[in-house]
């Protein structure tokens, strides 16, 4: 007898070995039809995903996985990647297959082919995929030896797949999945048949180096998306359209904020307007430092390699570090700021009475990211972090973490982000420090979130070897998630670099070090801001807060006077004194997403007033200049958004 325990605790008895599909069928025809895989666990072991054809020989716990489960959606996407490869091989037999993983919201598959795939090719491939899905071919799992698999794939000319398999230890049994005439290496599991794959779309083709190495052949990567329902896919495609409209690279060009060029890959050329936006963000964060007990510091850009070896960065991060040599010494361009802050801490001997000691820096970092991964301001090689480090005692951990989370929530709200997701990454199997101190650190992080009213997820084992962390993820205006802030407990670096304080018993002890950032990379955060607001920045952030437009040359001098008056008040304002029609001026400045347009003609000049238009169709009519000044000052002090006011009007 085999006893199967279901998620609701109920148990079912079977006279002998039973497959996942048979269990689903015994529960109901609807579940059997919806079943994509099973999640099975034996004798209290960790559950694992298996095919519906998986045979259960012993008592087990089993959950039937359907398209409603996150695992089910991943199965659909991974199986659709194989369906893509099947279709490509059907249409282009000379193409060679390589790898095809699941990614966020979809999948990709890399191919080697003698010519680039065209948009017409993608249409034909997608049509072929739909045809193969309609055939509802059974997907079966086969086990091969490594050498058998290498010989097979070499024999059919699949040299890339043979190379992948040859790198697997010879004593491992491999799983291959077959659907129709196509067979591919895969750990699985897969959907039981191609007919389960109903909703998918190929998105684009791009270049990708074999094994991610620029010295290797350039392959063609076909991206696709797959979903459990057409409604889900339609919502995703709509979000993509909106994301394209909001793309910070496009808006950056249109609003003359910044640009990129080939001579500086992964680096940004900031234009005056863009740098004005940057300055507002940095100055805001500088005040955050000042108001919350941080001392701003500045550490060197390059440090001798011996220091990076002491911290462990060289062993674990060297591929991402830029180096330079001078006078027979090798230096590393800093990829992060923490070692420099420890050196500043070590410059003097500190008493426990001085702790917590909080350092903050707008630290410029450089990381040698692969060229293929660079993406506007979201993934760069040179960036600035609002990086801070807190040196404290174990007893101060919880208060410091709670204060940081409360501060982070306020900062995000000020920038227009009100939805934050919280995740606590706990101790990994390989770690340093006693269980007692890990208990204290993890408890401090979780309790700090509870104290600030946060619901959070726990990611077991995802902490660093030197301490647990909290990750803070923002949700933007179109529902995308961006991981920005973090606070991480570090028991290791203070010890490695000899950081000490004198405790109340006159004993020297290493402090606990908290790595913390709210915005993360300022470049990336500004890119997020641009996309979240679709370029229409609230007045407190806008590079230009207002433009004063004269209707004719008669009112040009009055427009110039108003502009100067506003500038003296500290506002960022320009005058448009051109002899163009006022309708053209209004259109041009509206496209530049200026929060306020002040229009002045003979009537306004005679009465000492201004006609005020706000972004998003807000019309304040004709008002006194002092009233506008008061309004703009309130917008800035409250960080109010003009477009939100317009939509509420």
Curated annotation (Swiss-Prot):
- How is its cofactor bound, per UniProt? Binds 1 zinc ion per subunit.
Catalytic, as annotated region: 247-538
Q: Which residues bind Zn(2+)?
A: 338, 389, 515
Instruction: Tell me where it resides.
Output: Cytoplasm
Enzyme Commission no: 6.1.1.3
Kindly give the SUPFAM superfamilies that the UniProt entry links to this protein: Class II aaRS ABD-related (SSF52954), Class II aaRS and biotin synthetases (SSF55681), TGS-like (SSF81271), ThrRS/AlaRS common domain (SSF55186)
**One GO cellular component, as annotated:** cytosol
Q: Where is the TGS domain?
A: 1-66
Q: Which PROSITE patterns match?
A: AA_TRNA_LIGASE_II, TGS
Q: Where are the transmembrane segments?
A: none
Q: Which reaction does it catalyse?
A: tRNA(Thr) + L-threonine + ATP = L-threonyl-tRNA(Thr) + AMP + diphosphate + H(+)
Q: Which domain of life is it from?
A: Bacteria
* GO MF annotation list: ATP binding; metal ion binding; threonine-tRNA ligase activity; tRNA binding
Task: Kindly report the protein's main subcellular placement as a broad class.
Answer: cytoplasm
Keyword Cytoplasm listed? The answer is yes
A biological-process GO annotation: threonyl-tRNA aminoacylation
List the cofactors.
Zn(2+)
Question: Per UniProt, which keywords does this protein have?
Answer: Aminoacyl-tRNA synthetase, ATP-binding, Cytoplasm, Ligase, Metal-binding, Nucleotide-binding, Protein biosynthesis, RNA-binding, tRNA-binding, Zinc
Family statement: Belongs to the class-II aminoacyl-tRNA synthetase family.
What is the stated purpose of this protein?
Catalyzes the attachment of threonine to tRNA(Thr) in a two-step reaction: L-threonine is first activated by ATP to form Thr-AMP and then transferred to the acceptor end of tRNA(Thr). Also edits incorrectly charged L-seryl-tRNA(Thr).
Q: Which HAMAP family match?
A: Thr_tRNA_synth
Q: How does it assemble?
A: Homodimer.
Kindly give the NCBIfam families that the UniProt entry links to this protein.
Answer: thrS
Record-given protein name:
Threonine--tRNA ligase
Q: Which organism is it from?
A: Bordetella pertussis (strain Tohama I / ATCC BAA-589 / NCTC 13251)
């Amino acid at each position: 007898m085999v006893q199967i325990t279901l998620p609701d605790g109920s148990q079912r008895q079977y006279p002998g070995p039973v497959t996942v599909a048979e269990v689903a069928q015994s529960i109901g025809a609807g579940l059997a039809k919806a079943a994509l895989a099973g999640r099975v666990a034996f004798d209290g072991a960790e559950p694992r995903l298996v095919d519906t054809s998986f045979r259960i020989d012993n008592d087990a716990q089993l959950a039937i996985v359907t398209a409603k489960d996150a695992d089910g959606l991943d199965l659909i996407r991974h199986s659709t990647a194989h369906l893509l490869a099947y279709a490509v091989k059907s249409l282009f037999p000379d193409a060679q297959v390589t790898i095809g993983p699941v990614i966020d919201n979809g999948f990709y598959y890399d191919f080697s082919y003698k010519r680039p795939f065209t948009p017409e090719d993608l249409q034909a491939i997608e049509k072929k995929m739909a045809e193969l899905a309609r055939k509802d071919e059974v997907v079966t799992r086969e086990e091969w030896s490594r050498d058998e698999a290498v010989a097979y794939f070499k024999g059919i000319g699949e040299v890339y797949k043979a190379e992948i398999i040859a790198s697997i230890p010879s004593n491992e049994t491999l799983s291959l999945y077959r659907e129709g005439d196509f067979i591919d290496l895969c750990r699985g599991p897969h959907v039981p048949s191609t007919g389960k794959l109903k909703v998918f779309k190929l998105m684009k083709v791009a270049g990708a180096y074999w094994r991610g190495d620029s010295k290797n052949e350039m392959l063609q990567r076909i991206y696709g998306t797959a979903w459990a329902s057409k409604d889900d896919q339609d919502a995703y495609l709509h979000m993509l359209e909106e994301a394209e409209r909001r793309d910070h690279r496009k808006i950056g060009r249109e609003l003359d904020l910044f640009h990129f060029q080939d001579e500086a890959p992964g680096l940004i050329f900031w234009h005056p307007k863009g740098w004005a936006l940057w300055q507002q963000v940095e100055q805001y964060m500088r005040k955050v430092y000042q108001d919350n007990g941080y001392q701003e510091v500045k550490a060197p850009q390059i440090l001798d390699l011996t220091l990076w070896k002491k911290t462990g960065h060289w062993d674990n991060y060297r591929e991402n570090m830029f180096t330079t040599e001078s006078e027979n010494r090798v230096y590393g361009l800093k990829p992060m700021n923490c070692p420099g802050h420890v050196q500043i801490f070590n410059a003097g001997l500190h008493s426990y009475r001085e702790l917590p000691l909080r350092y903050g820096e707008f630290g410029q970092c450089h990381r040698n990211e692969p060229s293929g991964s660079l993406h506007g301001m979201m993934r760069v090689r040179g960036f600035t972090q609002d990086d801070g480090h807190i040196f404290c005692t174990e007893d101060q951990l919880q208060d410091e973490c709670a204060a940081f989370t409360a501060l982070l929530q306020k900062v995000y709200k000020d920038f227009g982000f009100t939805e934050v997701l919280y995740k606590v990454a706990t101790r990994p199997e390989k770690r340093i420090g006693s269980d007692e101190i890990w208990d204290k650190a993890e408890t401090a992080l979780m309790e700090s979130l509870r104290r600030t009213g946060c619901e959070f997820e726990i990611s077991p084992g995802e902490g660093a070897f030197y301490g647990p962390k909290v990750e803070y993820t923002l949700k933007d205006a179109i529902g995308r998630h961006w991981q920005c802030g973090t606070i991480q407990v570090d028991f290791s670096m203070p010890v490695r670099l000899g950081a000490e304080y004198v405790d109340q018993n006159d004993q020297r002890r290493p402090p606990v070090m908290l790595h913390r950032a709210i915005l993360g990379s300022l470049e990336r955060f500004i890119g997020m801001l641009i996309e979240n607001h679709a370029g229409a920045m609230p007045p407190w952030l806008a590079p230009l807060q207002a433009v004063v437009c004269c209707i004719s040359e008669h009112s040009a001098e009055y427009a110039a006077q108003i502009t100067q008056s506003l500038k003296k008040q500290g506002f960022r304002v320009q005058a448009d004194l051109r002899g163009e029609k006022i309708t053209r001026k209004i259109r041009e400045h509206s496209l530049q997403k200026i929060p306020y347009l002040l229009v002045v003609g003979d009537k306004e000049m005679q009465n000492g007033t201004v006609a005020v238009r706000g972004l998003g169709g807000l019309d304040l009519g004709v008002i006194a200049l002092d009233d506008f000044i008061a309004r703009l000052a309130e917008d800035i002090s409250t960080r109010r958004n003009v477009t939100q006011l317009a939509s509420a009007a």
